[in-house]
Design a protein with these regions (language model features):
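Short, surface-exposed, charged amphipathic helix/loop patches that serve as local interaction elements
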Residues: 27-114
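Short acidic-hydrophobic surface loop/beta-edge motif
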Residues: 18-28
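Extended acidic low-complexity intrinsically disordered regions
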Residues: 1-18
Length: 114
């Protein structure tokens, strides 16, 4: 196998891994999410962050990454306005923090000073 094939297999395994969840007491539900996402999903979130639209980036990450227990999207793009204007920002921040932290695979010991 080539290095690229190995890299693709590694990422497929991460994408197909078990869903993680965060319990949202205020909403009386659990939000499920994956431990990794392709750049196709991350690109819009990164673009919003680079434009200084941090709140929109948080909401976009929730829209793109929040899943039901069976792995289906919990929210649609049309829910963005409601999430930004009619939902508790503290809850949005907590969910986005959990979902976005899950994709960070760097452990403190992995980074060494030169």
């Amino acid at each position: 196998m080539s290095v690229l094939d190995n890299a693709k297999d590694h990422f497929k395994q991460k994408l197909s891994g078990e869903l993680k969840k965060i319990t949202i007491r205020e909403w009386k539900t659990d939000v499920y999410y994956k431990g990794a996402y392709p750049f196709a999903v991350e690109s819009k979130i990164l673009e919003l962050q680079q434009q200084g639209k941090v709140v929109e980036a948080l909401v976009e990450s929730i829209i793109q990454k929040s899943l039901t227990p069976d792995g289906k999207k919990m929210f649609q793009s049309g829910d963005k306005w409601t999430l930004m204007n009619e939902v508790d920002p503290a809850v949005i921040t907590r969910i986005a923090g959990a979902i976005n932290s899950a994709t960070l695979d760097v452990q403190p010991g992995d980074v060494e000073k030169n």
